[in-house]
Amino acid sequence: KSGMEKTVQELVKELRKMSSVVQTDKDLANVACVSAGGNTDIGSLISDAMAKVGRTGVVTMEEGKTAEDQLVFVEGMQFERGYTSPYFVTDPERMICEYENCKILLVDKKISTARDIITILESAIRGNYPLLIMAEEVEQEALATLVVNKLRGTLKVVAIKAPGFGERRSSYLEDIAILTGGTVVGDEMGVSLEQATDAVLGTAAKITITKERTTVVGDGSTAADVAARVKQIRNLQMQTDQDYEREKLQERIARLSGGVAIIQVGAQTETELKEKKLRVEDALNATRAAVEEGVVPGGGCTLLRLSEKVDVIKRRMTDPEQQMGADIIKRALCYPIKLIAQNAGVNGSVVMNEVMKNLDRPHYGYNAATDSFENLMETGIIDPSKVVRCSMENAVSVAKTFLLADVVVTELKEIEAGAKPNPVAPGAAGFGGGL
């Protein structure tokens, strides 16, 4: 067990030396294309999305409303919260609420009645400016008052729920306050709702609200504050160890920085749409991984090259059991390229031997799509280093679990009469069974 762990730790260091930084948009497109099963359209779409929002920007995916794939770029800050009542819409044809030069009230608590915000509402009526109210919740009594005044034409107003929950909601509200130059009203902030005046209001150049989402475009007057906030969030991102938390912090940075790219996946049928969404999701994850840790030429060829480093690592081990663990890793690293070759209908051992004879050519490898040996970096057959690293680390983690388990229950597959065994399966002739 410890032999496998030590071997993989050393191989990860070797992998980092073999990795190349993603330098061009074409490299990103190639990574996405390979991960999407060779779909060049998906690769180009993801490459274009990253070109618009930057390498560290946020690219999301959603179901499109047409049969064609589309790339939509949203300026400003967008989040998944829509208007609380359809009576707030200003454009009945498109069912959206849209205001320019809008004031924003940010409340980190529930608004129970209109009396809670009477001072703010009176200021909006006197100033004749549109008002967006963003709160944890606007309860029925307060909502009814706002709707009646909107329908009468007394107030240009719209209310939405604040994005997020708990601490994350408070952070989002702070982000919006910094973008718009406002102040968050709440007990924890030291500003009570009853005493709040128009001094706490933020300003947006434009707001667009649909049934499902809200977009706020700042007026640019708070650029310095936004830059400082982004720097602060980046520091938090560097300190956290959780991938989910890091991803959410990255989303906040992208929203504050002024843009999110949305890939709208289109298809003719529901079945095609599900399959296509999985391909796009895989391609997006692979592209992010490539930006994070670089790329290597062909994952199978890279693993085979790493297998040649194992003997050096093994010689530094004194424990025979650890050396056995290193041997297991070496044999395992040879399997992927054989399986790739077999799936392409060629002899895996022949392909492996050809690559092994050219270890001095770091980018040389087998392209299963064209059944040829070539420079994989030049032809775009590249894989994210992070994917290769995680595959090794996760494989060892699973193997450790099996070694420590008393018993493993699995389904016994019946081999049909006359069926040929998998030539790269553990226990096949020439591959030292027992792995």
From Swiss-Prot:
Q: Where primarily located?
A: plastid
Record flagged with keyword Chaperone: yes
- Induction behaviour: By heat shock.
Provide an example Pfam family for this protein: Cpn60_TCP1
Q: Which InterPro entries match?
A: Chaperonin_Cpn60_CS (IPR018370), Cpn60/GroEL (IPR001844), Cpn60/GroEL/TCP-1 (IPR002423), GroEL-like_apical_dom_sf (IPR027409), GROEL-like_equatorial_sf (IPR027413), TCP-1-like_intermed_sf (IPR027410)
Which keywords accompany this UniProt record?
ATP-binding, Chaperone, Chloroplast, Nucleotide-binding, Plastid, Stress response
Q: Does the keyword Plastid apply?
A: yes
| Compartments, record wording | Plastid, Chloroplast
Query: What does this chain do?
Result: This protein binds RuBisCO small and large subunits and is implicated in the assembly of the enzyme oligomer.
* Family affiliation: Belongs to the chaperonin (HSP60) family.
State the oligomer form and interacting partners: Oligomer of probably six alpha and six beta subunits.
The miscellaneous annotation reads: This protein shows ATPase activity.
- Please state what the protein is called: RuBisCO large subunit-binding protein subunit beta-1
Q: What organism does this protein naturally occur in?
A: Chlamydomonas reinhardtii
Q: Show the taxonomic lineage.
A: Eukaryota, Viridiplantae, Chlorophyta, core chlorophytes, Chlorophyceae
